[in-house]
């Protein structure tokens, strides 16, 4: 039996509609417009695409979008000054510094200079610690999007066995913590995990976030399990013509879909949820900053 496809594109549209509804209410009832500031250093083509998309969706949700584009040779002091100015700006409720930064800039230093309350990426060490102790925090966008889709599909996740493949600070570790906070029994697997196929076969939920194209085959998946594929990998596609490529996840989609009960596709699965959750975090931050009731269903 073919797996149910978890349509991240459709679910992200639903989340963005919820965000827009809350933004309208905040404007009408309190005269406040949530604002998201994005800082881009340099001219990395992929980063430019992401920043444009974030700005477009921010405006479509009714929020203010502030873009700060800096030269690739911008000094650390100048970048810190921009972040400090945004920290102090009451019209800015979310701050995102687009990664990666040029090599001469200390990413950890820059990220930890952001006001934790405005850290809508959820990367500040204070937010990492709050999430790790089960307290209110800003939650990283990609893991939050995965959690939302899992909750939508399953309802309660309590008691389920979950395996997260990947231990990055951006996805793997916070994803595991979110699942633990939802009362899953969680295993974090990685490149050194012994008997990885057997570990994965015991999971009701598999989150693949390792960055290796089609690493997880269908025979690793427990029948009926839910597979969340975070990977976005570009591989050669000679069947499309010379020099052509295609996007694949960390899971071999066709074989996993034959065994799984539900699966996210690549593209169109986790990816669209990341920006939707960035908008959700910005609204949440705005509400917290102004002592307003937080919107339900838009955070962990």
Swiss-Prot record:
GO terms under cellular component: cytosol
InterPro entries: Aminoacid_DH-like_N_sf (IPR046346), NAD(P)-bd_dom_sf (IPR036291), THF_DH/CycHdrlase (IPR000672), THF_DH/CycHdrlase_cat_dom (IPR020630), THF_DH/CycHdrlase_CS (IPR020867), THF_DH/CycHdrlase_NAD-bd_dom (IPR020631)
Alphabetized UniProt keyword annotations: Amino-acid biosynthesis, Histidine biosynthesis, Hydrolase, Methionine biosynthesis, Multifunctional enzyme, NADP, One-carbon metabolism, Oxidoreductase, Purine biosynthesis
Catalytic activity, reaction form: (6R)-5,10-methylene-5,6,7,8-tetrahydrofolate + NADP(+) = (6R)-5,10-methenyltetrahydrofolate + NADPH; (6R)-5,10-methenyltetrahydrofolate + H2O = (6R)-10-formyltetrahydrofolate + H(+)
Residues the entry annotates as binding NADP(+): 166-168, 191, 232
UniProt pathway annotation: One-carbon metabolism; tetrahydrofolate interconversion
EC nos: 1.5.1.5, 3.5.4.9
Annotated family: Belongs to the tetrahydrofolate dehydrogenase/cyclohydrolase family.
Protein source organism: Roseobacter denitrificans (strain ATCC 33942 / OCh 114) (Erythrobacter sp. (strain OCh 114))
Functional note: Catalyzes the oxidation of 5,10-methylenetetrahydrofolate to 5,10-methenyltetrahydrofolate and then the hydrolysis of 5,10-methenyltetrahydrofolate to 10-formyltetrahydrofolate.
Pfam family, one: THF_DHG_CYH_C
Keyword Amino-acid biosynthesis among UniProt keywords: yes
Protein name according to UniProt: Bifunctional protein FolD 2
Top-level taxon: Bacteria
Gene Ontology terms: biological process: L-histidine biosynthetic process; methionine biosynthetic process; purine nucleotide biosynthetic process; tetrahydrofolate interconversion
MF-aspect GO terms: methenyltetrahydrofolate cyclohydrolase activity; methylenetetrahydrofolate dehydrogenase (NADP+) activity
Subunit-structure text: Homodimer.
Upper classification of the organism: Bacteria, Pseudomonadati, Pseudomonadota, Alphaproteobacteria, Rhodobacterales
